[in-house]
Amino acid sequence: MSRRHRAEKREINPDPKFGDTVVTKFMNAIMFEGKKSVAERIVYGALDQVQEKTKQEPVAVFHQALDNVAPHVEVRSRRVGGATYQVPVDVRPERRQALAIRWLISAARGRNEKTMVERLSGELLDASSNRGTAVKKREDTHKMAEANRAFSHYRW
């Protein structure tokens, strides 16, 4: 299914409260079945809780959490001869952000606080201080890449 042209990037509007496009992307990733207002309530509620607990700017804590979760290298499968090698490759900036958002949300959903607002704020606080499930996921990804460094010459 090749395309004649590369699909152009869509313009993402900044969110109304903080004026940040990354917060909008995060909201869109949390959203189920097009329920944007529910996603907004969850994200803004979590950021308000973060502000109450840390007494810091919530968007700064959010960005710190994303930076701490975003992977620098990952492994990709590459077939050479009859063998499949896990080849470490650098992660593009857009993919870094997308993976960080995805991992933060899945880690928050896996927590066992009562509401999603509490789960998300807890995971954001953990990730901003280099703890939590999402940060562990990044560490595991980096370990895999380090373990397979011998195959880095198979890069493409």
Curated annotation (Swiss-Prot):
It comes from the Bacteria. CDD domains: uS7_Bacteria. GO terms for biological process: translation. SUPFAM superfamilies: Ribosomal protein S7. InterPro entries: Ribosomal_uS7, Ribosomal_uS7_bac/org-type, Ribosomal_uS7_CS, Ribosomal_uS7_dom, Ribosomal_uS7_dom_sf. PROSITE patterns: RIBOSOMAL_S7 (PS00052). One of its GO terms (molecular function) is rRNA binding. GO terms for cellular component: small ribosomal subunit. Keywords: Ribonucleoprotein, Ribosomal protein, RNA-binding, rRNA-binding, tRNA-binding. It holds the Pfam family Ribosomal_S7. One of the primary rRNA binding proteins, it binds directly to 16S rRNA where it nucleates assembly of the head domain of the 30S subunit. Is located at the subunit interface close to the decoding center, probably blocks exit of the E-site tRNA. Belongs to the universal ribosomal protein uS7 family. Part of the 30S ribosomal subunit. Contacts proteins S9 and S11. This is Small ribosomal subunit protein uS7. It comes from Chelativorans sp. (strain BNC1).
